[in-house]
Amino acid sequence: MIKWPWKVQESAHQTALPWQEALSIPLLTCLTEQEQSKLVALAERFLQQKRLVPLQGFELNSLRSCRIALLFCLPVLKLGLEWLDGFHEVLIYPAPFVVDDEWEDDVGLVHNQRIVQSGQSWQQGPIVLNWLDIQDSFDASGFNLIIHEVAHKLDTRNGDRASGVPFISLREVAGWEHDLHAAMNNIQEEIELVGENAASIDAYAASDPAECFAVLSEYFFSAPELFAPRFPSLWQRFCQFYQQDPLQRLHHANDTDSFSATNVH
């Protein structure tokens, strides 16, 4: 039985949050006990600092809140919670939502249309999510809405807008941009060959550098076995930035499971 440090610190009148149940989602089971303990500590602080706002009748309970907080904190497990400064609210719809989108064409005409969004991240504003896609983020499939939007927040710490280059040292920027654009070109080539639906990486990654960083951050944490062998140089840059190696973590967890299985009598 794990001795969770947050339970020791709870005052007697507080109701214990269901952290152990919240950690049971497939994405988090590969973490070591030490990593899980640190992640929960960050998630507790996240819930103290941020306001989760349910919209359109969505019901937010303690388990859902804990799982949302854990996913927010996974990318900053080693970076620290201060990397999530700059927003105070997380707005949560029950399902994908409709927004007004304004864009300018090549001749300067401004167009307005209503589009369906899964999530949004504003540089100096809230993160907007929907519960259906949050639930789909619990497994290790390569899709993770929360990590995607967190990546955008981390990206904008480097400047006024998301560029696909997070806050790294200047001497590393050129190499990062080179490897990121090489990945985008590779993904685009696959799309042209097999089509968007058959591509092994979400086609959205080829749309622009900011989306490539966000999409590949999803794969970094939830499908490292797809990311690492395909883009090894960029993988190493992600490992250095996030200060984590999810592929090594996955291999260690699999080895542990195999060892346990062979020792069952």
From Swiss-Prot:
Disulfide bonds: none
Domain of life: Bacteria
Listed GO CC annotations: cytosol
Enzyme Commission number, as recorded: 3.4.11.-
Cofactor: Zn(2+)
Reported function: Involved in the modulation of the activity of the glucose-phosphotransferase system (glucose-PTS). Interacts with the transcriptional repressor Mlc, preventing its interaction with DNA and leading to the modulation of expression of genes regulated by Mlc, including ptsG, which encodes the PTS system glucose-specific EIICB component.
Protein name, as recorded: Mlc titration factor A
